[in-house]
Structures are given as structure tokens and as C-alpha cells.
């Protein structure tokens, strides 16, 4: 499977898993989500947040590891993730896959919304 990141340009990543992270605009703490690409869409396998507050409450069953609250969300696969730009978070989203991290804003250029979805025929 591959992941397509679609904005002003399309980026195709040959990977079966990826991590999406960002810094919360108010709390200034890190949020990470680990995703797997499946036939049915994108499945979140773990979420973690560095601290809590202002809309960043850890999920059900979360455990604190000394730095992060970690949990496994119980939700069905999603067909795509829509990632919006925010002036409150200048660095935006970071996507890591196959040992390399990329700032989504670097790929999106002028796109306000970037979609991440399983590739179908390279698109």
C-alpha cells in the first residue's frame, strides 16, 4: 500500500504506516498519531499527547509513560484525513514514514486543506 498526500501537489509514499504529529496551538505540547494503511482506509493504531488540557484530553484507557499519555483509539478506518492550515500553528503538521519526516506545509504550498489517503492507482 502507499499513502497519497494531496494538496497543491501530490506526494506518494511507499509505506504501510505513518506518524502524524503537531504542536497544540494553545498548550504548545506535542500530539502524535500512529496510522496504518489498510484496504478499508486509514486506521489509527495509537495516539499520544504530551500533557493534557484545552481540548487535549487523553483518550479512554490512556496510560502515562512519564512524558506522554498513550492510548489506542477504537474507531473504524477512515477513507482519508483532511489537514487544514492554521496560522495559530505555524509549523503545521509533520508526517513521518519510512524513516523520514516531512512538514506537510512544505508539500502543500498554497493549499488550505491537504488530504492524506490510501493511494489508488498512484492517485
What name fits each language-model region?
Residues 58-123:
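Mature, soluble, non-transmembrane domains
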Residues 4-58:
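N-terminal secretory signal peptides
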Amino acid at each position: 500500500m502507499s499513502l497519497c498526500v494531496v494538496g497543491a501537489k501530490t506526494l506518494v509514499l511507499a509505506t504501510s504506516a505513518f506518524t502524524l504529529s503537531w504542536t497544540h496551538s494553545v498548550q504548545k505540547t506535542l500530539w502524535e498519531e500512529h496510522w496504518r494503511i489498510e484496504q478499508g482506509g486509514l486506521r489509527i493504531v495509537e495516539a499520544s499527547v504530551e500533557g493534557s488540557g484545552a481540548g487535549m484530553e487523553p483518550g479512554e484507557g490512556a496510560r502515562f509513560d512519564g512524558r506522554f499519555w498513550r492510548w489506542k483509539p477504537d474507531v473504524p478506518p477512515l477513507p482519508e484525513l483532511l489537514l487544514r492550515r492554521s496560522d495559530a500553528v505555524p509549523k503545521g503538521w509533520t508526517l513521518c514514514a519510512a524513516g523520514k519526516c516531512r512538514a506537510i506545509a512544505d508539500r502543500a504550498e498554497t493549499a488550505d486543506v491537504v488530504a492524506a489517503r490510501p493511494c489508488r492507482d498512484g492517485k
